[in-house]
């Protein structure tokens, strides 16, 4: 179920304050955050946000096409190492 429109998008308060501060200064430094559930808003466009994936912070450069998505969508938490090769000779 989608979030109610009367509530508006969720953005962590601490993250929003950091972005507004950098936006007013005109700086483009990397912002570290653990808030993967925060929604990307238009004020975040052009900033680089390092999103935590459980092990490290992955830098995400926000573009206009990302508005409306969550920050966690752009920092994968699992590493895919490929499927196991089936060895038919060892099964016999």
From Swiss-Prot:
Subcellular location per UniProt equals: Plastid, Chloroplast
- Signal sequence bounds: none
Is this entry keyworded Plastid? yes
Keyword field = Chloroplast, Plastid, Ribonucleoprotein, Ribosomal protein, RNA-binding, rRNA-binding
Offer a single GO CC term for the protein.
mitochondrial small ribosomal subunit
> Its principal location?
plastid
One Pfam family recorded for the sequence: Ribosomal_S19
Q: Which GO terms describe its molecular function?
A: rRNA binding; structural constituent of ribosome
InterPro entries to which the protein is assigned, alphabetical:
Ribosomal_uS19, Ribosomal_uS19_bac-type, Ribosomal_uS19_CS, Ribosomal_uS19_SF
GO BP, one annotated term: ribosomal small subunit assembly
PROSITE patterns listed in its UniProt record: RIBOSOMAL_S19
Output the PANTHER family linked to this UniProt entry.
Answer: RIBOSOMAL PROTEIN S19P FAMILY MEMBER, SMALL RIBOSOMAL SUBUNIT PROTEIN US19M
Q: Give the record's family classification.
A: Belongs to the universal ribosomal protein uS19 family.
Job of this protein? Protein S19 forms a complex with S13 that binds strongly to the 16S ribosomal RNA.
Name of the protein in its database record: Small ribosomal subunit protein uS19c
- Quote the gene name from the UniProt entry: rps19
């Amino acid at each position: 179920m989608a979030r109610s429109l009367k509530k508006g998008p969720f953005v962590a308060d601490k993250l929003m304050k950091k972005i507004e501060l950098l936006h007013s200064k005109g700086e483009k430094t990397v912002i570290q955050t653990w808030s993967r559930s925060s929604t990307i808003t238009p004020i975040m466009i052009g900033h680089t946000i390092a999103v935590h994936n459980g092990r490290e912070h992955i830098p995400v450069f926000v573009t206009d096409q990302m508005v409306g998505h969550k920050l966690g969508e752009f920092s994968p938490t699992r590493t895919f190492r490929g499927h196991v090769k089936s060895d038919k000779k060892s099964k016999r």
